[in-house]
UniProtKB/Swiss-Prot annotation:
Compartments in which it is found: Plastid, Chloroplast thylakoid membrane
Encoding gene, per UniProt annotation: psaJ
Keyword hit for Metal-binding: no
Family that this chain belongs to: Belongs to the PsaJ family.
Membrane-spanning ranges: 7-27
UniProt KW keywords: Chloroplast, Membrane, Photosynthesis, Photosystem I, Plastid, Thylakoid, Transmembrane, Transmembrane helix
Membrane topology recorded in Swiss-Prot or TrEMBL: Single-pass membrane protein
Protein name: Photosystem I reaction center subunit IX
Top-level division of the source organism's lineage: Eukaryota
GO BP, sorted A to Z: photosynthesis
Function comment: May help in the organization of the PsaE and PsaF subunits.
Length: 44
């Protein structure tokens, strides 16, 4: 079990999870605010 924890905490695994999450977040932002260079809720 300790070996599995060590494997899952290595940098490539964490980087893959982080970049996958970030890509999904950017895709969802672009779905709701397409082609937004400045987001509508920041305009005054």
């Amino acid at each position: 079990m300790q070996d599995v924890k060590t494997y899952l905490s290595t940098a490539p695994v964490l980087a893959t999870l982080w970049f996958g999450f970030l890509a999904g977040l950017l895709i969802e932002i672009n779905r709701f605010f397409p082609d937004a260079l400045i987001f509508p809720f920041f305009q005054f």
